[in-house]
């Protein structure tokens, strides 16, 4: 094993090699800061950050960071939930106040900056918190802001703060100390499942390297290690015949907090498999530690990771992400570089794969060890679990994994695509016309298939959607709670004689994502892929449509894994709303049988044999002539059976009135589903987003004394009835993070406040400023969605699935929204069906 204190030196060497074309020997320059971020010192000495983030028009977040002052010692008495709710500000999941590694962070989210008086009040309020503390402090403002004007206001408000000397972030007291004694904890419970987790600790990135390429190298290696461990653990559990639920692999890095880095690998299994799962987990870690990975496995892992890195590089970070990055910079000296810097390093080919693999293996070897720097936890463990015996078993399994070589190939088989070779009759374009709503081009081919294409250059990827019509209502004898499993069956087939798991790996290593979406009346596949993989995507889709074969072992594994899962809260709410309705994507325990797979295969065969009934939507960084050429070459490989299928009528009878229950086994909170029959028109669709903001404001005001975070989501359905729904999730905030004027978190009293908010929200006065601000926010979100390739695909899938055009006049529809429309919508939703689930 490599001593951990040397692994950061190795990473620094790697960073030097990678950037050797621009970096003088023996130095690593600081990374360039994101151009959206401005940093400096106010006249009082407080550090400020302004971050331009246009993701939400008219909204911003403010944070105050008090270094080395824990929240228990911070002057939080001036934080008032009542005042903040009047400003239209509700707490996030962590509350208004949180302790971050011994420092206090005040975070005020979703502030309606479209109101000048709210902007000034919240800035003044934030500087009041600054003035009450003698700690070294920073103020962060991120959102739809004019950074110059915000800086002017901060200069004025800083005059009320006594001048202070603010030092740069530092951690002079940090010293890495290896822990030779493992730590074992067991937490028994009555749950039928148990969670086994292993956490390894390692030295953090040295302070002087936090804003250099070494931090990027360390983070990327950490991401790749997590990916490798997940992939291996899934396969090893499968080979051992151990059903599992969630595999949770996460980490705390050097920019997350000020102590050691931590990497956690956890798996949920049936309680009787606790010991066996722990052994597999130990053996998996030992294999990576002792023998490392092959260049092929490492290269494949990088390919699988590429979409994630690219998304971060081209997307706009959330305001919460901006706040966290600025907090890490102030507390630990972390980089403010844009994520494009990570992509720049990730894409460079300076090193041979074998050399980079060797560095990666050194990184993994330095982190993972047999019993050093280790915490072993059993949550929901059997009462009889012996911690000493489990530690012995872990050690024994680790020795076995270290000594006994494995014959398995752990790569993603990225080069094994030859089986997808297909010979297709050529087709021609029969007609071509502009798609009226989105500006794309609609091609109809001689075999009847239709394709809509819109080029959006520059991203290096394309998005796709294949809509095939005929949803769950076309499946005879479907059982309640069975429909949610149907879509998953598509991932359990062998394809073109490639085993199911290997085909999934092949898609992943090619950067091709494929998500199945089912509803009452439609079936869609959607995802994205690198631009250079368009031909591979078409060949994969043809193989999936025509050359599927049921894999019984994959079904058995999936079935056993699903037996450990519980219904999602969303599934539970919907099942309570429409008991007995079978055509939903709910997954209910005990409803998955061999008949489910047979129903799914018959259904998929009907859909894939009639490809002319659907439509393929493409948008992204593709050249039109190349797209045409490949479509004419490959679309003839799809089947276009001209026979028709009968359509089945579906009746829906949701409950009316209020149904309330107490349930257990979910995170504590109040979960509500509002449902009403309401025409799905363009006007109503956009009104739903504005009305949701009015509801959020009412909930924030009524819940201010009770300490709950608020999450809202709106949905609509066109089949079998036109309906709108609003899902409300309210979770209690940790008590240490609450203002002093929060009286109680009693869920019954909080629920009474929720019902009061629902009863009054439709009649509460709506100011012109709020209505204009909410409409502007909705307009900017819709426009940004339509301008993106993924939004283009989603928009057209929605249109062809629902036969509704809600986008062609979106600007006019949003502009026309008035207070009466908002009132009508809220009246309908709050007087319709209401499911309330209380989790104590």
Positions of the model-derived regions?
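Bacterial N-terminal signal peptides
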Residues: 11-20
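Proteolytic maturation boundary segments
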Residues: 24-52, 135-141, 145-219, 230, ...
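Long, His/Glu/Asp-enriched segments that create or flank divalent metal/ion-associated functional microenvironments
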Residues: 218, 222, 226, 701
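Conserved short beta-strand edge segments in small beta-sheet-based binding/regulatory domains
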Residues: 550-557, 644
């Amino acid at each position: 094993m490599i001593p951990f204190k040397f692994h950061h030196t190795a990473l620094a060497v790697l960073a030097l090699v990678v950037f050797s074309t621009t970096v003088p020997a023996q130095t690593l320059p600081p990374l360039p800061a994101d151009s959206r971020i401005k940093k400096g010192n106010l006249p009082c000495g407080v550090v400020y950050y302004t971050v331009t983030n246009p993701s939400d028009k008219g909204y911003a977040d403010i944070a105050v960071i008090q270094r080395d002052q824990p929240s228990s010692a911070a002057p939080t008495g001036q934080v008032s939930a009542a005042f903040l709710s009047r400003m239209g500000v509700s707490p996030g999941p962590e509350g208004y106040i949180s302790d971050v590694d011994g420092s206090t962070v005040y975070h005020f989210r979703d502030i309606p900056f479209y109101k000048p008086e709210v902007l000034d009040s919240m800035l003044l309020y934030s500087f009041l918190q600054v003035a009450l503390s003698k700690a070294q402090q920073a103020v962060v403002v991120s959102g739809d802001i004019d950074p110059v004007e915000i800086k002017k206001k901060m200069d004025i408000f800083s005059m009320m703060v006594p001048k202070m000397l603010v030092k740069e972030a530092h951690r002079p007291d940090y010293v890495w100390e290896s822990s030779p004694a493992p730590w074992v904890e067991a937490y028994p419970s009555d749950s039928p499942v148990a969670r086994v987790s292993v956490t390894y600790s390692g030295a953090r990135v040295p302070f002087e390297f936090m804003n250099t390429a070494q931090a990027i190298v360390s983070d990327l290696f950490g991401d790749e290690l997590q990916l490798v461990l997940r992939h291996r653990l899934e396969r090893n559990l499968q080979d051992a015949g151990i059903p599992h639920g969630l595999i949770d692999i996460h980490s705390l890095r050097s920019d997350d907090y000020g102590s050691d880095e931590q990497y956690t690998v956890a798996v949920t299994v049936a309680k009787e498999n606790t010991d066996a799962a722990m052994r597999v987990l130990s053996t998996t870690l030992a294999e990576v530690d002792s023998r490392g990975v092959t260049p092929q496995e490492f290269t494949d892992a990088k390919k699988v990771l590429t979409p994630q890195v690219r998304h971060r590089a081209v997307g706009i970070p959330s305001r919460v992400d901006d706040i966290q990055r600025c907090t890490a910079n102030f507390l630990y000296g972390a980089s403010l570089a844009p994520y494009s810097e990570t992509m720049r390093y990730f894409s460079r080919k300076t090193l041979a794969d074998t050399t980079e693999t060797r560095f990666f293996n050194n990184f993994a070897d330095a982190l993972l060890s047999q019993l050093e720097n280790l915490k072993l936890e059993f949550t929901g463990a059997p009462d009889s679990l012996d911690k000493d015996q489990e530690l012995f078993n872990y050690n024994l399994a680790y020795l076995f994994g270290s000594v006994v070589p494995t014959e398995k190939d752990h790569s993603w088989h990225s080069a094994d695509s030859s089986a997808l070779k297909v010979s297709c009759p050529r087709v021609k374009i029969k007609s071509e016309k502009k798609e009226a709503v989105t500006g794309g081009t609609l091609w109809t081919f001689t075999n009847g298939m239709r394709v809509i294409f819109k080029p959006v250059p520059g991203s290096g990827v394309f998005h796709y959607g294949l809509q095939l019509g005929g949803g769950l209502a076309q499946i005879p004898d479907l059982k309640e709670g069975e429909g949610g499993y149907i879509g998953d069956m598509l991932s359990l087939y062998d394809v073109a004689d490639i085993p199911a798991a290997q085909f999934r790996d092949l898609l992943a290593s090619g950067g091709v994502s494929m998500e199945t979406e089912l509803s009452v009346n439609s079936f869609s596949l959607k995802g994205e892929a690198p631009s250079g993989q368009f031909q591979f995507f078409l060949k994969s889709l043809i193989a999936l449509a025509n050359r599927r074969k049921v894999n019984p072992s994959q079904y058995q594994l999936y079935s056993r894994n699903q037996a450990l899962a519980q219904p999602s809260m969303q599934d539970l709410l919907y099942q309570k709303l429409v008991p007995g309705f079978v055509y939903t994507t709910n997954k209910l325990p005990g409803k998955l049988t061999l008949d489910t797979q047979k129903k799914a295969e018959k259904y998929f065969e009907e859909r894939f044999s009639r490809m002319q009934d659907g439509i393929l939507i493409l948008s992204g960084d593709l050249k039109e002539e190349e797209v045409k050429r490949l479509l004419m070459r490959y679309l003839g490989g799809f089947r276009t059976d001209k026979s028709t299928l009968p359509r089945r009528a579906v009746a829906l009878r949701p409950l009316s009135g209020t149904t309330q229950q107490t349930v257990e086994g979910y995170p504590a909170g109040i979960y509500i589903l509002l449902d009403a029959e309401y025409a799905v028109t363009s006007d109503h669709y956009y009104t739903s987003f504005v009305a949701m903001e009015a509801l959020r404001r009412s909930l924030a005001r009524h819940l201010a004394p009770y300490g709950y975070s608020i999450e809202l989501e709106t949905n609509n359905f066109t089949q079998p009835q036109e309906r709108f729904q609003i899902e409300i999730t309210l979770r209690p905030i940790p008590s240490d993070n609450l203002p002093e004027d929060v009286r109680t978190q009693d869920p019954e009293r909080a629920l009474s406040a929720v019902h009061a908010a629902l009863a009054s929200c439709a009649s509460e006065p709506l100011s012109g400023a709020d209505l204009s601000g909410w409409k502007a926010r909705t307009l900017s979100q819709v426009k940004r969605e339509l301008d993106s390739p993924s939004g283009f695909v989603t928009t057209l899938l929605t249109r062809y699935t629902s036969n509704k055009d809600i986008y062609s006049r979106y600007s006019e529809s949003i502009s026309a929204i008035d207070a009466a429309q908002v009132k009508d919508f809220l009246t309908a939703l709050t007087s319709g069906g209401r499911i309330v689930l209380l989790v104590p």
